Amino acid sequence: MRFLSTFALLVTAIAVASTATPASAQVIDSTYRVDAKDLYVMMFRADWCPPCKVVEPRLDRALQTLRDPRIEYVEIDISSPGASEIAAHAAFDREVVPQYNRWLGLTGFAAIVDATTKRTLGCVNVLYDAASMTSHIRTLKQQALRDEQTVDFTCPEAHNPG
C-alpha cells in the first residue's frame, strides 16, 4: 500500500511539473512561447538582386555580432513563386503582413520591425557596413523596448501603396 501511495504521489508531481509554464515563456492564447522575439529583421531579397549580394553578408555579420536570440531574421525572398509563397507565410505567421505588402517587389534592404507592436522601426541597406548595421539594430531594439518613437528615413518608399 505504501508503494502505491508513493507511486501516485510521484505521478502527480510529474504531471504538475510537465504542465508548468517556464518563467521565461510568454503566454499567448493559453499556450506559451519560450522563443518570444523583440525584433524581426525582414530581409527583402531575390537571387537576381545586386544590392542583396552586398547587404546580406553584412547583415549576417551584424546579426552574428549581436547574437541576440530575441532578434529573428525573416527572409522575404521573391526569387521564385515558391520562395514568394514561403515569404508570404512567414509574414503572416509573424503578423507583419503590412510591411510585406508595402515593400513586396522591392529588394536589397532589411526592415527592422518591433515584434510586439508590429511597428517598422527603421531599415538597413547597402549604405550600411556590418558595424553600422549592428549599431543601428541594437539602437532600434533599445528604443522599442523603451517604447520610444523612432524617426528613421532609411526605409524605401512604399512599392505597393495602400
Regions found by a protein language model. Give the residues of each.
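Bacterial N-terminal signal peptides
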Residues: F7-S18
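A short beta-strand-turn-helix
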Residues: A23-L39
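Short, internal strand/loop/helix patches
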Residues: E85-T116
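Thiol-based oxidoreductase modules, predominantly thioredoxin-like and allied folds used
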Residues: D68-A90
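Short active-site neighborhood of thiol/selenol oxidoreductases, capturing the structured segment around
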Residues: D35-C49
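Typically the conserved alpha-helix immediately C-terminal to a functionally engaged Cys/Sec
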Residues: K53-R67
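Non-catalytic, surface beta->alpha helical segment in thiol-disulfide oxidoreductase systems
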Residues: L104-R146
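Non-globular targeting/processing and membrane-anchoring segments
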Residues: A25-Q26, S132-G162
